[in-house]
């Protein structure tokens, strides 16, 4: 068996096109365009690249984009005051604080200061709680994007044994909630899991988000399983690789995401989708 590729780049491009069309319709109806504020603290190179991509995405779909590039020594109180101002700004539908933050800043406190209706990353405890109670509002972008990728395969998730490798607040935990909502029987593995191979090898669907290149061996993948690789790791030779041993896994899986070009583009597209949703359903 050779796996079919889940082309996140193409699916994300289609989603951006739909969002841009809706923004055009809003303009024609005399409605304001959605607004996204992006806060970057410090000069972390990877964060600067991610933020540049997000701003480019906003321009592509016609959003209002406000950039706040702040020095690394910005204080907690200064950031809280900025978030308060953006919470009160009617032109802004979404507020994004780029992670990671400098060590002196409390990320949890800052993210919780964002009004839940403007939490387009979907990290606020209120939005995670809504997802847990099967009433999602603004959903975490990466898990939401993965559900869109899974839908593109046409696979029926109901009753599938799904294994999530990694239990972070950003991907693993909300991913488990999304899969539960999708009808899967879900197992979450983490760094204390004793026999990772045993869990992965029985899974109909594997979502790997551990940040460790090649952690999941291709031979562990069950024949015909769906493999979603969230990991993106730069090797010494400059190559980007995922958390799954791709070449072997692709010979066993029915569907697999490439790295790069799989999950990453969908995360960005879902940030735009959340911002549009906030504008249309929470703020208009």
Curated annotation (Swiss-Prot):
GO terms for cellular component: cytosol. One of its GO terms (biological process) is L-histidine biosynthetic process. Pfam families: THF_DHG_CYH, THF_DHG_CYH_C. Its EC number is 1.5.1.5, 3.5.4.9. Keywords: Amino-acid biosynthesis, Histidine biosynthesis, Hydrolase, Methionine biosynthesis, Multifunctional enzyme, NADP, One-carbon metabolism, Oxidoreductase, Purine biosynthesis. GO terms for molecular function: methenyltetrahydrofolate cyclohydrolase activity; methylenetetrahydrofolate dehydrogenase (NADP+) activity. Signal peptide: none annotated. Gene3D superfamilies: Leucine Dehydrogenase, chain A, domain 1, NAD(P)-binding Rossmann-like Domain. InterPro entries: Aminoacid_DH-like_N_sf, NAD(P)-bd_dom_sf, THF_DH/CycHdrlase, THF_DH/CycHdrlase_cat_dom, THF_DH/CycHdrlase_CS, THF_DH/CycHdrlase_NAD-bd_dom. Catalyzes the oxidation of 5,10-methylenetetrahydrofolate to 5,10-methenyltetrahydrofolate and then the hydrolysis of 5,10-methenyltetrahydrofolate to 10-formyltetrahydrofolate. NCBIfam families: PRK10792.1 (NF008058), PRK14186.1 (NF010783). Belongs to the tetrahydrofolate dehydrogenase/cyclohydrolase family. This is Bifunctional protein FolD. It comes from Pseudomonas paraeruginosa (strain DSM 24068 / PA7) (Pseudomonas aeruginosa (strain PA7)).
